[in-house]
């Protein structure tokens, strides 16, 4: 039996590794239908047409000593999950009932967007430093689990 979780998580990792626009972190996300077909991929980076941190040679968050998992508005990068949802929407591809494979646990902003987009399950590879206080109700309505490599 094929290990679909491993297969799709490896693709999400490859998407993250191909990201050269963010100096600080590389995240990848993948949206997958129930029939195991890939809807879209996304990685964290600057919006289209905007110079990335890699191109500028510095990270605004690093320069201003902003901790990971805090003050998301201090960076204009689009998160991997957000990009995956945006690319699906741009191409008119429904996401309701899909699974999101992502290389790190979604931040609270991405969690809300994934719930609103009808994602049925989130499978993440690593923990993310953001505290989720107050988001228990939102997290309770979407299936979420950490990827198990066993």
Go through the PLM ranges and name each one.
Residues 1-150:
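Zinc-dependent deaminase catalytic domain
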